[in-house]
A protein has these predicted regions:
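Cytosolic catalytic domains that perform sulfur/thiol-centered chemistry
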Residues: 1-398
Length: 398
């Protein structure tokens, strides 16, 4: 039988508080127009909606932040049915969570939230915006929804979010290194998609990487309000929202960008700029790659011959293979909470007070880490666009 307890009473003894709501509510999205925003200070997020998909490995990674045992006092808060589901699931792990925080949102304790929670939008918010309903954190002016992908136009035609445009990453990258195109070419691409600096752009993709890559490039260009659908296309489908088919509707081109381009050049580092960070104690070159890539066992790419790592780089984690970013994702493919990512990076002495340059092979995984850090409120961050691919071609870097 669940036992109600106030937050102050529960905290008189060491224990763990778990928020069983979805990550959007935990991060700070109100559950109603102008409603309460955030989560109990120090609470951990274990959403009931994850349980059917959460593997043992994912739970081990989740619990590594603060290991739990059969003796750990655990209290839950959220919807009653979610609390019951999480309690039953934890019981299978021989963990006991009989307490319920009765005053999670009515006590005097301040709530915490992700500083940039509005940058990661939930599917329900986007659906309401498209339907012209009132929403929290509404875009100030013109907004557009864009699906990002590489060679995915036919897939887009088969099904996409109603009203969405399609932007292929091939329009934004140039061979041979797949770095961002020159400023004038970038200006032309954005104009063709009707994007000005004051356009709110809401991005999604079939996997997390394409949306993150385009989001970073748009921010570098100077688009002021760039948001990403947290959980991507999968989140939209799982919510059962409408799906359109066919080509994107015609887009009215923008006459001008409305600002110098790039307006945020510091977000995209060149090879000399990346090299200059290596000898600075207040900076980190952060490799967002698999351990096999970071340790030099493989390059990760069939078109990159050299194996190894930038000397002095720190491992920012990634996942399995060149497209893997599991270390940053919840079981439902939403981004992990700030406490988890912060602890993951602190283990490699990667902290918010440093000048951070994320990189990977060619910029995609690094962009996801950038989007994550940006939402966490980290400010002195950028992406070394050339990554290991460019670095490995310059032997004098060694």
């Amino acid at each position: 039988m669940a036992q109600n307890i106030t937050l102050s009473q529960f905290r008189q003894n060491n224990g763990v508080v778990i928020d069983t709501r979805n990550s959007a509510l935990y991060n700070g999205w109100p559950d109603a127009l102008h409603g309460t925003s955030g989560h109990v200070s120090g609470a951990r997020n274990l959403a009931a909606s994850w349980l059917d998909e959460m593997t043992d490995a994912q739970f081990d990674a989740w619990s590594a932040l603060r290991p739990l045992s059969a003796e750990t006092r655990i209290a839950l808060y959220g919807e009653p049915e979610d609390n019951a589901a999480v309690e039953a699931w934890l019981r299978q792990k021989e963990l006991h969570a009989p307490w319920r925080i009765s005053d999670a949102f009515s006590c005097d304790c301040p709530l915490e939230r992700l500083p940039g929670f509005h940058q990661l939008v939930p599917a329900c918010w986007l659906n309401a915006l498209i339907a012209h309903r009132q929403v929290n954190e509404k875009p100030v002016g013109k907004w557009t929804v864009i699906e990002a992908g590489w060679g995915m136009r036919d897939t887009f035609r088969q099904g996409h979010i109603p009203g969405a445009d399609y932007l292929d990453t091939g329009e934004l990258e140039s061979e041979p290194l797949w770095n961002v195109v020159a400023p004038e070419a970038l200006r032309n691409v954005l104009a063709a998609h009707g994007i000005r600096c004051d356009t709110t752009v809401i991005l999604y993709s079939r996997t997390p990487l394409a949306a993150a890559r385009v989001a970073h490039i748009l921010l570098y260009a100077g688009v002021e309000d760039v948001r990403v659908l947290d959980g991507g296309w999968r989140a939209w489908l799982c919510a059962g929202f409408p799906v359109a088919s066919g080509d994107a509707l015609p887009i009215k081109s923008a006459c001008d960008f409305g600002a110098p381009l790039p307006a945020q050049p510091q977000l995209m580092l060149s090879l000399p700029q990346a090299r200059a960070l290596l000898n600075r104690k207040d900076a980190s070159m952060v490799s967002v790659r698999s351990w096999a890539e970071f340790s030099g066992a493989t390059s990760g790419y069939d078109y990159i011959d050299a194996c190894g790592e930038i000397p002095g780089a720190r491992w920012g984690r990634g996942g399995r293979g060149k497209d893997g970013v599991e270390d940053f994702l919840n079981p439902d493919a939403t981004l992990r909470c700030a406490d988890y990512v912060t602890a993951m990076w602190e283990a490699w002495n990667i902290t918010a007070d440093q000048h951070i340059a994320f990189y990977c092979g060619t910029g995609w995984r690094a962009s996801l880490a950038f989007i994550c850090a940006r939402a966490m409120g980290w400010t002195n961050i950028g992406v070394y666009d050339g990554g290991w691919y460019e670095w490995s071609l310059h032997h004098n870097n060694g």
